[in-house]
Regions:
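Short, Lys/Arg-rich flexible segments
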Residues: 1-74, 102-152
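Mid-chain, well-packed structural core segment of small domains
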Residues: 70-101
């Protein structure tokens, strides 16, 4: 009889967790997204970009899927075009071409390069993203395990 009561309690605890799972999964992805966003902001700060105002770092926002099944860090939505946050982030990430001079016959360009190298802060962040996600998932699983133990 004692075993049956304990089994019923375990079953009820599991049922409660399964009912809360979609919300908990969204919570996990929000945690992972915030952690990856912090890592990306550190990569931007250490990349050498002159971002003393923090504008480029502020542009990077966490997006959670509508069903809560994924998290992405990307430039904020807004205006489109060559001077939008997404375009500027892309130029900084991957580099960009410098337009050739179109001046008069005596014009001498200050720069003598045809391409500006990128800072690759998204690439550097993606190398650490998996370990960040694993760490957050382990902490999330530990919280669920503690809740299960407490309910028994």
């Amino acid at each position: 009889m004692e075993n049956r009561i304990q089994t019923d309690r375990i079953g009820a605890a599991f049922d409660k967790i399964l009912q809360e799972f979609p919300e908990r999964r969204r919570e996990l992805h929000e945690r992972v997204g915030r952690a990856v966003q912090r890592e990306l902001q550190q990569q931007i700060a250490s990349s050498g970009i002159n971002d003393s105002s923090g504008k480029v770092r502020r542009w990077q926002v966490v997006h959670i899927g509508s069903g809560g099944g994924y998290a992405a860090v990307r430039p904020e939505k807004g205006t489109t075009g060559a001077d939008s946050p997404g375009a500027i982030t892309n130029y900084l990430e991957g580099g960009h071409r410098i337009a050739s001079p179109r001046g008069g016959k005596n014009y001498r360009p200050r720069l003598r390069v045809s391409y500006v190298s990128g800072y690759h802060f998204y690439v550097n962040t993606s190398m650490r993203a998996e370990s960040i996600a694993i760490g957050e998932a382990e902490a999330w699983a530990d919280e669920i395990a503690r809740e299960l133990e407490a309910s028994l």
